[in-house]
Structure formats: structure tokens, C-alpha cells
Amino acid sequence: MSGSICKTAFAVLAFGLSAFSGSYAEAASRFMQTGAVTSQPIGHYQFCQIHKDECSIISENSGPARVTDFGWNVIKDVNSEVNHKIMPMTDQDIFGRDEVWTYPTDVGDCEDFVLEKRRELMAKGFTVSNLLITVVRKPDGEGHAVLTVRTMDGDFILDNLDDRVRLWSETPYRFMKRQAEYNTGRWVKIENSQDVLVGAVEK
């Protein structure tokens, strides 16, 4: 084989590997990689003492949901409607103490929005293993809670600070931990949040 042919073949191979690597990384960034079991947020622990039946659901991991166009409309509507019908207010202002997780009526903190969205989506047929309470840190370092919806297209975020439903890797947050899809009372670490943040900066 001549040198020019070898160089051409090598260039084609290198391009192919680069394209594969890029597409693989892009696909991987659509899904959170979870790791070891970690600590349960104190607010969720206290919530579970009241709502024991909601925190002891064991699920067979059937994989992320296949969401139809109608299903996406339901997800977007629930996110927007809950964001607009509940007035944001801190636990300190409502209860005089921090980390009170509860179903809201007219006011609530971020985790209360999450609980309500989760409850409404479950009532509309979404499985609990694909609706996961998730703890993140905002760019200023403040803790925050969002709802992760696991789908075959990626992990999407419902956030009381944003009416859009966005892929988790397109949000400005550092993802810390979330409920385990197999047990509503267990929490697991999110391993690839830093990788996604670095990738977003490099784009």
C-alpha cells in the first residue's frame, strides 16, 4: 500500500473515531450517571415520616419512559401550571424553620413545587421510577430542588424557576443527588455533573 493511500486511510479512520467519540459523548451527556447510595435530605426524611407509603415504593427498573408528543405536552403543562399557581416562599417565611417538605396549597419552597409536579404527573400515568426528586446547586452555591423526568430522549428537568422543560445538561446547575429509580426512599449520587459543566464551558 502506498504512503499516500495509508495517510488517506488513517485520516478517514481518525475522522470516524472522532465523530463516534463526539456522538457518544453527546448521547451520554443526555443522561445522568448515578453512583453509590448517599444521604437522604433531612427534609425528605421528615416528609417520609408522614407519608410512609410514598417513600417505600420498590420499582423494577423498566428503563426511561418513551414519551409521546401528547406526553410532552402534559409534562410542559404541569410544569408551567404548578409554577404559576403556587407562590414561591421560603420555609422560614412559611413555617419559621428550614427544610419542611410538604404538598403546597398556595405557597411553597422549591421542593414543594417538585412534590406537587411529581404527584400530578403520577396521577396522569407517569411511573414513579421516572419522576425523581433531585438536589442541585445553583451557580451562586445555594441549594435547590428540581424534578427529573427520565425519558428515552434524556433526563429532563422541571424547575420552579423556569417554565421551560430542559435537558439536565442544558441547565446551569451542579447536580448532586437524586432519588434512586428503584426505591423512593433511597438517594444516589450523580457522578457526571462536573463533566457536563466542563463540556458546556468548552462549547
Question: Where do the model's predicted regions map?
Answer:
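Bacterial N-terminal signal peptides that target proteins for export
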Residues: 1-10
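Bacterial N-terminal signal peptides
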Residues: 10-19
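A structural boundary/capping signal
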Residues: 24-203
